């Protein structure tokens, strides 16, 4: 029997809409509660250093009201680690960050920044947080994740999602499959996310080694037309359908 694939709903772009006008609405706290009610297994928030969407207040309030769990994405900086220390998130994910990017453009380079990443992992673990590293589907980066003591990785699916041809998409899917298999063989918990939407999620969801998908922009965009709860339910349905037909 195939294990259930979890869905983490990223609600950053609820805050993006709010910050565009500097209003008090729409409220990410309400979005988190609605996503949970619709079946989300967790809520993911990326509090960027430039505070372009999620604010510290959002994180504090959501931490108080969640019935599931919060996954806090953060850059490897003193300011963000200090904030995480205050919040003590159940789950945290270290991600690369550039101020000029529209969205996260690639995975964390553990090989280049090993000492800094290792210290951050240890610090978060001392807070009681389960630490994940957002990395490209690359075996050397996966080995490095093990070396710095992270129990969880999240594979960056952006190249797969952005592929402009079937050949390129197939190539990127194979990279993710092989990376997931390799990581699982090293006893890592393997999650995935970035750029996944309703038309490309099934091949990723069918990868048996994956534990959780983190999806945000596509769900929030669909919610504009059908409501957030229905958007979450539909994504869960597609993921479940993909898992149903994976051979044991």
Swiss-Prot record:
The keyword DNA-binding belongs to this UniProt entry's keyword annotation: no
Binding of 3-amino-2-oxopropyl phosphate, residues: 10, 21, 195, 216-217
Record CDD domains: PNPsynthase
Disulfide bonds: none
Positions of the record's site feature: Transition state stabilizer: 154
UniProt: 1-deoxy-D-xylulose 5-phosphate binding residues: 12-13, 48, 53, 103
Reactions listed under catalytic activity: 3-amino-2-oxopropyl phosphate + 1-deoxy-D-xylulose 5-phosphate = pyridoxine 5'-phosphate + phosphate + 2 H2O + H(+)
EC number: 2.6.99.2
GO molecular-function term, one example from the UniProt record: pyridoxine 5'-phosphate synthase activity
Location relative to the cell: Cytoplasm
Active-site residues, Swiss-Prot/TrEMBL: 46 (proton acceptor), 73 (proton acceptor), 194 (proton donor)
Record GO biological process: pyridoxine biosynthetic process
Gene Ontology cellular-component annotations: cytosol
Gene3D superfamilies, sorted: Aldolase class I
Family matches, as NCBIfam families: pdxJ (TIGR00559), PRK05265.1-1 (NF003623), PRK05265.1-3 (NF003625), PRK05265.1-5 (NF003627)
Family statement drawn from the similarity comment of this UniProt entry: Belongs to the PNP synthase family.
The protein's name in its UniProt record: Pyridoxine 5'-phosphate synthase
Organism annotation: Legionella pneumophila (strain Lens)
Lineage: Bacteria, Pseudomonadati, Pseudomonadota, Gammaproteobacteria, Legionellales
Gene: pdxJ
